Amino acid sequence: MLTHRVEPVYPPLARQIHKEGQVELRAIIATDGTIQSLQVVSGDALFLNSAKDAVTQWRYRPTVLNGQPVEIETYITVIYTLQH
């Protein structure tokens, strides 16, 4: 469960050219709830750094298995839409 979310910054160039998009990331969440590893699965290059910068700051409640926190893999989609 996500306990702390940092919103990604909309990249200025993408905003200027009215571009929307999304980034899919593969994340390893460590036993302490931090993002241990982050890989880009897909997404427009304009949004990659912004998505990674935000998601690396996210914090999760650790997943517990048999009473012990465990590392898990998950996929995260960050969507960029302009307000109309």
Which residues are covered by each model-predicted region?
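Charge-biased low-complexity segments
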Residues: 1-84
